Amino acid sequence: MDHYGLILSVGLIPENELSLDEGVTLDARTKGATVDEYFQTDRPGIFAAGNVLHVHDLVDFVSMEAEKLADSAARYIKEGKLPACEIQVKTDKNINHTVPQRISGTEDCCLSLRVNRPFKDCVLVVSH
């Protein structure tokens, strides 16, 4: 893309026609774009957040993602790139999906996840 732009959309279900037009990889579980911890897709300079990634229960989470995306996009513009995110986030059968799908392992980051069913007295283990 030879231009900068900001596209805002309001809706619940991920619609990714623009993502597909740009060759962005979609996640089979979320039906949204795959992103790294900076909310950058697998296409450098193309970022995604909110319901275009996965359905959110609260707009607060969309706002938090958008804030992180804005910081990341500004860093990308300033530095010309972001740290490589080559660690794939994998889940077991009890977790439907996570966002992001890739992390760097060099910075703290937040993982959003959706479980397949409600759990009681459970423990979440994150390891590398």
Model-identified regions with their sequence ranges:
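A Rossmann-like FAD-binding core segment of flavoenzymes
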Residues: 1-17, 107-128
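FAD-site-proximal beta/loop scaffold in flavoenzymes
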Residues: 4-56
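Short, solvent-exposed amphipathic alpha-helical segments in soluble enzyme
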Residues: 21-25, 64-65, 127-128
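Generic structural motif recognizing short loop/turn segments at the entrances and edges of beta-strands
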Residues: 22, 29-31, 83-85, 107-109, ...
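A structural detector for beta-sheet-dominated domains
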Residues: 36, 90, 100, 114-116, ...
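Non-transmembrane, interaction-prone segments in cytosolic or luminal domains
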Residues: 42-43, 63-64, 70, 74-76, ...
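A conserved FAD-binding loop/helix module that cradles the flavin
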Residues: 49-92, 96-98
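Short, solvent-exposed loop/linker segments at the N-terminal edge
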Residues: 101-106
